[in-house]
Amino acid sequence: MFTIVKRRELNPTVTELCIHAPLIAKKAKAGQFIIVRAKEDSERIPLTIAGFDREAGTVSIIFQVVGAGTMQLNSLKEGEAVHDFVGPLGKATEIEGLKNVCVVGGGVGCAIALPIAQALHEQGTKVTGIVGFRNKDLVILEDEFRACCDEFIIMTDDGSYGEKGVVTAPLEKKIVEGANFDEVITIGPLIMMKFVVKTTKPHNVKTVVSMTPILVDGTGMCGGCRLTVGGQTKFACVDGPDFDGFEVDFDEAMHRGTMYKPFEAHAREAECNLLKQEVQ
């Protein structure tokens, strides 16, 4: 039984679930992911581990409600259990030996960036955090980031909180001013990561991107998560999810990411209709 021991709404569309999964908590590392299934007939959802407590035996996941699967997951309450919770999967983010790192997160991708920033902080690395959101209402995990970052910058598209603009603006400024980052680690929408790489590459600042494309089985068998990295086919679930940002074909990844949008919309509509029937 993978029981939900705590539930927290981070903003109107983003939820955090803390789930009792002692075996996963024992092995989990920052950057790895799990595959969760809310109910027996639910779709398999890959979610990067947002936190873990080895002593309590719990693992935290953070997700945005966007489709039928996440709607079903979001319907579960404290004390209820998810049907499947498999992991940890993928390779952990490599942070050993890093002295000065900039972690750049966007939207719900900040949930993935946070445990990496925390792990860096715990090993004594200087951490600069830059996160971006569309507006103030969508800001998440601010206190947690401030606790583990030596410097922390919030950007919003409309300027309703923090500084107005996109994450690449302060990143470019820091690099030009001589921040001397050993590495930039970025997690968020594909378009954001693409432009982070466009910002860092001219300065030859190593940039690691966390790729979470279509994932089904999580073991490399289905091939749904394939990416082109350095001209070669890679599988995010077993070769990643972290890759050298300079080598990733973002245009291909973005095209593949839109392939199932009509099916997702249909599934979401069907789930909404079922929920309406239950209410009636």
Regions found by a protein language model. Give the residues of each.
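Ferredoxin-reductase
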Residues: M1-E80
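Structural signal for conserved beta-strand scaffold positions within catalytic alpha/beta enzyme cores
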Residues: K6, G51, I154-T156, V209, ...
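A generic structural signal for residues embedded in beta-strands
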Residues: V36, D84-F85, L227
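Short, surface-exposed secondary-structure boundary micro-motifs
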Residues: K39, G87-P88, G230
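Short, Lys/Arg- and Gly-enriched loop/turn segments at beta-strand edges
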Residues: S42-G51, L89-K99, C237
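FNR/FR-type flavoprotein reductase catalytic core
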Residues: A68-V216
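Local cysteine-cluster metal-coordination motifs and their immediate loop/turn environment
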Residues: I112, L190-I191, T212-D242, A270-K276
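Short Fe-S-cluster ligation motifs
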Residues: F235-D239, F243-Q280
